[in-house]
């Protein structure tokens, strides 16, 4: 059973302004967004606060995790969550590797469906919140496990999202050791991104994996995501181009659905001097596997998309090792 403070969240009354800086911020009660908030006078009259007392707890929890990867995209619908699920399955294919997936797309959680964990719930113990395990070495945490049903909307503003993300990072017990934590985020650069990068900064993030599709309308927003990473001092581990051509499951022929009118993801990486991890073809069976909550690699191991994804995962792990070698120089 989920902790009492997160039960029935779909019925929680929302009183915080849309761009609330948060009661712990130096700008609490002073921003334009605070005007009209019933708590404005309380926030603005508080004495300056010291460091967040939860940060040491977050650092202690995350220090048990070797590698932390953010999966980002500028545009929605490019397959970011789909790729997060496949990355998680691929890493967990090695039984000696412990993997955790954290779904921070608070208003649109989809990992539980893709990883076959819909309808599950969180359990609490003395050591924290227990993730839902979809395999012996693959655990998942998502707000979806706290909702009354799958159709319940989460209509939260920034401060509430910030609070839940803090609880996920502070209270989820991944066990004594985790090799990889893969964090799925919503599209764009929103409260979720600011919160997770702020809280994880001290303990260290290996970097971000950015997902795009070939067409320029997606690359426009990817450039903004890259700019966000650079301003937030998040290393970009690389970019993967998803839905890069359509492979017919019957004849194996390939055609371009989303044409790379400006050169696609590879050209973008060349221009911005970023690692290009590879391209994954559009295969309708990926969607079928995600809807069924099954590993695409188990169901379609010989498909071109399966080989392409595994190549991207290998390239990603190489980038992580390169980063570690540079730190040790």
From Swiss-Prot:
Highest taxon of source: Eukaryota
Keyword line: 4Fe-4S, ATP-binding, Cytoplasm, Iron, Iron-sulfur, Metal-binding, Nucleotide-binding, Nucleus
MF terms (GO), sorted A to Z: 4 iron, 4 sulfur cluster binding; ATP binding; ATP hydrolysis activity; ATP-dependent FeS chaperone activity; iron ion binding
Binding site for [4Fe-4S] cluster 2: 248, 251
Biased composition (Basic and acidic residues): 8-18
InterPro entries: Mrp/NBP35_ATP-bd (IPR019591), NUBP1/Nbp35 (IPR028601), P-loop_NTPase (IPR027417), YlxH/NBP35 (IPR033756)
Main function: Component of the cytosolic iron-sulfur (Fe/S) protein assembly (CIA) machinery. Required for maturation of extramitochondrial Fe-S proteins. The NBP35-CFD1 heterotetramer forms a Fe-S scaffold complex, mediating the de novo assembly of an Fe-S cluster and its transfer to target apoproteins. Required for biogenesis and export of both ribosomal subunits, which may reflect a role in assembly of the Fe/S clusters in RLI1, a protein which performs rRNA processing and ribosome export.
Subunit composition and interactions: Heterotetramer of 2 NBP35 and 2 CFD1 chains.
Name of this chain's protein: Cytosolic Fe-S cluster assembly factor NBP35
């Amino acid at each position: 059973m989920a902790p009492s403070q997160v039960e029935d969240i779909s019925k929680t009354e929302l009183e915080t302004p849309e761009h609330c800086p948060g009661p712990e911020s130096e700008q609490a009660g002073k921003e334009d967004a605070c005007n009209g908030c019933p708590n404005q006078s309380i926030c603005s009259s508080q004495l300056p606060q010291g460091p967040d007392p939860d940060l040491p707890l977050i650092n202690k929890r995350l220090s048990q995790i070797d590698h932390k990867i953010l999966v980002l995209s500028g545009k929605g619908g490019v397959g970011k969550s789909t790729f997060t699920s496949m990355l998680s399955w691929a890493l967990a294919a090695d039984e000696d590797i412990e993997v955790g997936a954290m779904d921070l797309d608070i208003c649109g959680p989809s990992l539980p469906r893709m990883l076959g964990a819909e309808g599950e719930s969180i359990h609490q113990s003395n050591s924290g919140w227990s993730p839902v395990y979809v395999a012996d070495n693959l655990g998942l945490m998502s707000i979806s496990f706290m909702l009354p049903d799958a159709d319940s909307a989460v209509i939260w503003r920034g401060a509430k999202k910030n609070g839940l993300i803090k609880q996920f990072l502070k209270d989820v017990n991944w066990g004594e050791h985790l090799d990889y934590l893969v964090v799925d985020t919503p599209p764009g650069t929103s409260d979720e991104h600011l919160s997770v990068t702020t809280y994880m900064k001290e303990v260290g993030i290996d970097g971000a994996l950015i997902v795009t599709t070939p067409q320029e309308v997606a690359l426009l927003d990817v450039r903004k995501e890259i700019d966000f990473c650079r301003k937030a001092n998040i290393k970009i581990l690389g970019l993967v181009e998803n839905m890069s051509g359509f492979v017919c499951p019957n004849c194996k022929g390939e055609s371009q659905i989303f044409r790379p009118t400006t050169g696609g993801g590879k050209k973008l990486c060349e221009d911005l001097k970023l690692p290009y991890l590879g391209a994954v073809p559009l295969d309708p069976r990926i969607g079928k596997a995600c809807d069924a909550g099954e590993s695409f690699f188990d169901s379609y191991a010989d498909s071109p998309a399966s080989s392409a994804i595994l190549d991207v995962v290998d390239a990603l792990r190489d980038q992580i090792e390169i980063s570690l070698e540079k730190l040790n120089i």
